[in-house]
Amino acid sequence: MARVLNVEIPNKKRAVISLTYIFGIGKTLASQILKDANVDENKKVESLSEEELTRIREEAKKYVTEGDLRREINLNIKRLMEIKSYRGIRHRKGLPVRGQCTQKNARTRKGPRKTIAGKKGK
């Protein structure tokens, strides 16, 4: 297994797919990285030379990925909660942030149903 940005990427897959195992790199960005590094995206990782892997690593370093990206996202959410914006309040309450209805749905965000005593038979 090759290592790119401290992440083990699978050898048996194509380079463009293997790069998507890194948090913050999707298919489009993976294709762009490989194009900038002059590497064929259909080539399997196991058949890449050490020089090609080095070029890929150098290109991938230019982007915010993994721990830095997670930290940035968490800081953005924390900032929203501190300034008490609508989105920050929704994050704090554990409700959907992007305007979805919550009367019947939103179970993923709200968690399992909490039964209330005395509500039965209404």
Curated annotation (Swiss-Prot):
SUPFAM superfamilies: S13-like H2TH domain (SSF46946)
GO biological process: translation
Residue ranges with Basic residues bias: 106-122
Residue intervals passing through the bilayer: none
Keywords (A to Z) from UniProt: Ribonucleoprotein, Ribosomal protein, RNA-binding, rRNA-binding, tRNA-binding
UniProt KW Ribonucleoprotein keyword: yes
Superkingdom per UniProt: Bacteria
Entry keyword Plastid: no
Pfam families in the cross-refs: Ribosomal_S13
Record's GO cellular component terms: cytosol; small ribosomal subunit
Molecular function in Gene Ontology: rRNA binding; structural constituent of ribosome; tRNA binding
PROSITE patterns: RIBOSOMAL_S13_1, RIBOSOMAL_S13_2
Region (Disordered): 94-122
Known role: Located at the top of the head of the 30S subunit, it contacts several helices of the 16S rRNA. In the 70S ribosome it contacts the 23S rRNA (bridge B1a) and protein L5 of the 50S subunit (bridge B1b), connecting the 2 subunits; these bridges are implicated in subunit movement. Contacts the tRNAs in the A and P-sites.
UniProt cross-references to HAMAP family, sorted A to Z: Ribosomal_uS13
Similarity comment: Belongs to the universal ribosomal protein uS13 family.
Assembly: Part of the 30S ribosomal subunit. Forms a loose heterodimer with protein S19. Forms two bridges to the 50S subunit in the 70S ribosome.
Protein name, UniProt field: Small ribosomal subunit protein uS13
Source organism (scientific name): Metamycoplasma arthritidis (strain 158L3-1)
